[in-house]
């Protein structure tokens, strides 16, 4: 669904993805090391919704909010161990875009990712802010940009797993 006016653009999309007999990344213990390989998995279901909203209240400023929320469930057996995992996940971002002078842009973007669910592994919630400045020169023939990523140093990514093959907590 898409609703568009001069000031507002709203987009919504729902989806369902069901896969059987597919190749999945799996991890196993071998000589006190974790080894990542690929194996046949039974099924994977992912269903969710994409939403985005862009508002342009002035020529020099716009903002957008985007979110992808979905439920994922994975089922399979690898070397006798279940590699099942399931949960709700959300990836969201907020973008503020300023055009304070001719040919220039300043962007501030904030990302939030809730825990992600993969076969055998779950990741932690992460968030970060990026700030970018861009200037177009020579009538747009050249662009100079600077991007500062993870401004507040908050993008700590943790992974954990508890299954029949190993227990893992990485932080």
How does the language model describe each region?
Residues 1, 12-18, 65-71, 108-112, ...:
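Transmembrane beta-barrel strands of outer-membrane/channel proteins
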Residues 3-66, 91:
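Outer membrane beta-barrel strand-and-loop segments of large Gram-negative receptors
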Residues 16, 43-47, 84-92, 125-129, ...:
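Residues that define the transmembrane beta-barrel architecture of outer-membrane proteins
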Residues 69-74, 87-137, 160-161, 165:
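C-terminal beta-barrel architecture of Gram-negative outer-membrane proteins
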Residues 137-171:
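C-terminal beta-signal and adjacent terminal beta-strands/loops
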């Amino acid at each position: 669904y898409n609703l568009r006016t001069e000031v507002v653009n709203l987009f919504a999309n729902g989806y369902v993805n069901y896969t059987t007999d597919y190749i999945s990344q799996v991890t196993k213990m071998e000589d006190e090391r974790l080894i990542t390989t690929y194996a046949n998995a039974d099924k994977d279901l992912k269903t969710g919704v994409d939403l985005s909203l862009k508002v342009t209240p002035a020529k020099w400023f716009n903002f957008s909010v985007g979110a992808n929320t979905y439920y994922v469930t994975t089922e399979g057996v690898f070397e006798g161990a279940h590699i099942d995992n399931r949960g709700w996940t959300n990836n969201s971002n907020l973008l503020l875009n300023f055009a304070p002078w001719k040919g220039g842009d300043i962007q501030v973007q904030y990302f939030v990712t809730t825990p992600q669910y993969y076969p055998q592994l779950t990741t932690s919630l992460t968030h970060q802010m990026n700030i970018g400045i861009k200037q177009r020169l020579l009538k747009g023939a050249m662009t100079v940009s600077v991007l500062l990523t993870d401004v507040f140093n908050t993008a700590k990514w943790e992974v954990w797993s508890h299954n029949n093959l190993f227990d893992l907590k990485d932080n």
